[in-house]
């Protein structure tokens, strides 16, 4: 199984004073030798947080994805991309994980799955090794003008966490 000393964990996103300390503590508990990179926004209060490397990013803001007369819907995809990418630049370990700052580990069992089911076809390989995530699902969040005409986004990768070789996540 993969040793925690070979893992960089990029904790990305806004700091929640209640959940983020729990998130960091859970990483120390279940991945005790992992490198923790906290990647958040400039001007954020990061006092009393346990991390190894700090990355303070300029907040790119949200993206408007739908607008109706009574409601606007925004997406944080640019924030996730910036904070994850900048955190990965500081990662020094063979494996990397992108983790939202409000998630809490309850085990390290995800590591058991990284090298399971290694058979794969060569025609469709994008990465050196597979990337683990918690779920792939379908979203209906692309603006097309009318709510009834929303476009399906199949195989949308969850923003909760990703794990793989650092070179693949880069």
Describe each region flagged by the PLM.
Residues 96:
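Short aromatic/hydrophobic "clamp" motif used to bind/position activated sugar donors
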Residues 76, 106-170:
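Conserved catalytic core of nucleotide-sugar-dependent glycosyltransferases
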Residues 7, 38, 42, 77-85, ...:
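Catalytic phosphate/metal-binding cores of nucleic-acid and nucleotide-processing enzymes, i.e., regions
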Residues 99-100:
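Active-site acidic Asp-centered loop
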Residues 7-16:
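A conserved hydrophobic helix/loop-capping motif in glycosyltransferases and polysaccharide synthases
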Residues 16-30:
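Short, well-formed alpha-helical segments that are part of the catalytic scaffolds
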Residues 5-7, 28-38, 52-53:
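Short loop->beta transition adjacent to catalytic acidic/histidine clusters or analogous donor-positioning motifs
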Residues 39-90:
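Active-site-proximal specificity loops/subdomain of glycosyltransferases
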């Amino acid at each position: 199984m993969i040793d925690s000393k070979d893992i960089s964990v990029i904790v990305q996103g806004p700091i929640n004073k209640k959940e983020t300390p729990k998130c960091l503590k859970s990483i120390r508990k279940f991945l005790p030798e992992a490198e923790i990179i906290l990647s958040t926004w400039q001007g954020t209060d990061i006092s009393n947080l346990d991390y190894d490397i700090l990355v303070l990013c300029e907040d790119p803001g949200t993206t408007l994805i739908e607008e109706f007369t009574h409601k606007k819907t925004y997406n944080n995809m640019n924030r996730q991309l910036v904070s994850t990418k900048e955190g990965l630049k500081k990662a020094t370990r063979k494996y990397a994980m992108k983790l939202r700052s409000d998630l809490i580990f309850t085990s390290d069992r995800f590591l058991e799955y990284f090298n399971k089911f290694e058979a794969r076809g060569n025609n469709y390989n994008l990465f050196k090794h597979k990337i683990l995530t918690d779920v792939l699902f379908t979203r209906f969040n692309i603006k097309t003008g009318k709510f009834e005409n929303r476009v399906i986004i199949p195989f949308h990768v969850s923003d909760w966490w990703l794990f793989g070789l650092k070179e693949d996540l880069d």
